[in-house]
């Protein structure tokens, strides 16, 4: 049975790996999405992360496709009580460019609830910061959703340390709900935007961290080791070039060494390293097949030694 971890100061207890929902309705059709979701729950996973904007970037899409497929799966599987649903507002803008305007938050939440076919969003994220709206107004809008029973807990995504602190300071001053979860970009390659002030703030204030891009767009799987490998993925291959520059090859070499020592895959090791970092409750990773889900879930049982963690730290520094 999977050991669940409390997510910051929320009442959510989650498995130490979160399933990313950005592939549903983009890389994956309905049947493939259902297969991945079934495998995730069967393997002990609990939290599914999506957003209203997923996957507006795909030709013919307008946003909401991922939520719609997850909602269809929830109805077909009857597994609503086995999972926690996290979604986001703020990237799929309103008709006048609204991001976190109170009316847009309210309307977006209703649309997400309808697509998901649920009565409450377990964890609702501000998908990005919006300095055009006073932070207390944003939090008051979220507070109304919590009071109405439509949202369980709040999170912030892509916030800098100063803005996360000022938001929670405003919450304290005005008696409003806090951001108890942070979703930053963080992995062995991309570390400096989280490590330091932001990580320290999260640890000090018990803010649960669920990093996205935990596998650096797939680079940390070891699948892309040269430009010749870029063709292995039509959607991700073109994003690999920056990772091959600088410390990328050094990180892969360090992962290879740990893989030899443990028998684990590079993806499992990368996620286990992430899960071991201060403040991190569970990394987020997406999968395109049940086999990938099984591999990723294997990271939950992998404990790296202090020497292995140090070697990876040094390689990715």
Stretches found by the model and what they are:
Residues 8-25, 84-96, 120, 125:
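N-terminal small/glycine-rich loop or linker at the start of catalytic domains
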Residues 113-132:
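Active-site groove signature of glycoside hydrolases
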């Amino acid at each position: 049975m999977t050991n669940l971890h409390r997510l910051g100061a929320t009442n959510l207890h989650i498995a130490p790996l979160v399933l990313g929902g950005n592939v549903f309705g983009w890389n994956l059709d309905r049947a493939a999405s259902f297969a991945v979701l079934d495998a995730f729950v069967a393997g002990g996973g609990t939290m599914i992360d999506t957003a209203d904007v997923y996957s507006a970037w795909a030709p013919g899409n307008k946003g909401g496709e991922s939520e719609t497929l997850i909602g269809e799966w929830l109805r077909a599987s009857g597994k609503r009580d086995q999972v926690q649903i996290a979604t986001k507002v703020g990237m799929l803008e309103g008709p006048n460019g609204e991001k976190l305007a109170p009316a847009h938050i309210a309307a977006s939440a209703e649309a997400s609830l309808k697509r998901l076919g649920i009565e409450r969003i377990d964890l609702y994220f501000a998908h990005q910061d919006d300095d055009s709206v006073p932070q207390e107004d944003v939090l008051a809008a979220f507070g109304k959703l919590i009071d109405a029973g439509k949202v369980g807990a709040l999170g912030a995504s892509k916030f800098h340390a100063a803005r996360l602190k000022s938001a929670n300071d405003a919450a304290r001053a005005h008696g409003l709900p806090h951001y108890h979860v942070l979703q930053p970009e963080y992995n062995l390659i991309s570390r400096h935007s989280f490590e330091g002030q932001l990580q320290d703030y999260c640890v000090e204030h018990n803010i649960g961290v669920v990093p996205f891009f935990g596998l650096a767009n797939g680079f940390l799987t070891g699948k892309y080791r040269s430009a010749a490998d870029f063709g292995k993925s039509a959607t991700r291959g073109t994003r690999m070039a920056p990772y091959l520059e600088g410390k990328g090859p050094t990180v892969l070499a360090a992962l290879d060494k740990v893989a030899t020592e443990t028998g684990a895959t590079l993806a499992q090791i990368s996620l286990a390293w992430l899960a071991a970092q201060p403040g991190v409750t569970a990394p987020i990773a997406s999968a395109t097949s049940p086999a990938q889900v099984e591999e990723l879930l294997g990271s939950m049982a992998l404990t790296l030694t202090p020497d292995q963690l140090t070697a990876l730290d040094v390689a990715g520094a």
